[in-house]
Each structure stands twice: as structure tokens, then as C-alpha cells.
Amino acid sequence: MGMRMMFTVFLLVVLATTVVSFTSDRTSDGRNAAFNAFDLIALTARQNCCNVPGCWAKYKHLCGRKR
């Protein structure tokens, strides 16, 4: 294997380990700070999207209200 291939495999292993670790941590602890921060960011983005007519037209199902 070449150096580039080994580096790619290394990155894939690190990514897979991180995903498994994050999801198992989230299921074991409902108060995960990173997950709660992500929820807050998603909520803020959704609220801002609902105020923009073009974004609202594309994602009406996320806004939950009629315009």
C-alpha cells in the first residue's frame, strides 16, 4: 500500500471510531453537551430560515406555521 492509501485508511478508522464513540456516548448520557449545542444551532438555523421567504418556501415542513 502506498503512503496516501495508508493515510486514507487511517482517517477512515479515526472517523468510524469517532462516530461510534459519539453515538454510544449520546445514548448513554442524555445530557451530552455537544449534542445539545447541535440542537440549539439547528433550532436557530430553522428559525432564521422560516423568516426568509425563499428558505421558507423550500422547507415549509420545518417551520410548522402558515405564512
Curated annotation (Swiss-Prot):
Question: Magnesium: present as a keyword of the record?
Answer: no
This protein's species is: Conus pulicarius
Gene Ontology molecular function terms on file: acetylcholine receptor inhibitor activity; ion channel regulator activity; toxin activity
Family, per the entry? Belongs to the conotoxin A superfamily.
Instruction: Extract the signal peptide range.
Output: 1-21
Q: Which Pfam families match?
A: Toxin_8
| Subcellular locations according to the entry | Secreted
Query: Where does the entry say this protein is expressed, by tissue?
Result: Expressed by the venom duct.
Q: What does this protein do?
A: Alpha-conotoxins act on postsynaptic membranes, they bind to the nicotinic acetylcholine receptors (nAChR) and thus inhibit them. Has possibly a distinct nAChR binding mode from other alpha-conotoxins, due to a different three residue motif (lacks the Ser-Xaa-Pro motif).
Say where the protein is mainly found: secreted
Region Lacks the Ser-Xaa-Pro motif that is crucial for potent interaction with nAChR: start and end of each range? 51-53
Q: Name one GO cellular component term.
A: extracellular region
What is the protein name for this chain?
Answer: Alpha-conotoxin-like Pu1.1
- Point out residues bearing the modification Cysteine amide: C63
- Family matches, as InterPro entries: Conotoxin_a-typ
**Claim: Secreted is one of the keywords in the record:** yes
Q: Which residues form the propeptide?
A: 22-46
Q: Which UniProt keywords apply?
A: Acetylcholine receptor inhibiting toxin, Amidation, Disulfide bond, Ion channel impairing toxin, Neurotoxin, Postsynaptic neurotoxin, Pyrrolidone carboxylic acid, Secreted, Signal, Toxin
